[in-house]
């Protein structure tokens, strides 16, 4: 089961005001072999990109996949 994370920081200057932002994310997933050649994948990703002014930017992503190996 893969699990990961990431942290990003950014700084902007707007006029005489400095803006600092930090974001982070987490991912996780699992694969299940239903036959020797076919795997079902299920994954989730969360990102929090921080706040800009009074708005918070977050994303949630779920994924489902089928892999075929030859």
From Swiss-Prot:
InterPro entries documented for this protein: OMP/PagP_b-brl, Porin_opacity
Listed GO CC annotations: cell outer membrane
Any one Gene Ontology molecular-function term assigned to this protein's record: porin activity
Gene3D superfamilies: 2.40.160.20
Similarity comment: family membership: Belongs to the opacity porin family.
Protein name: Uncharacterized protein HI_0414
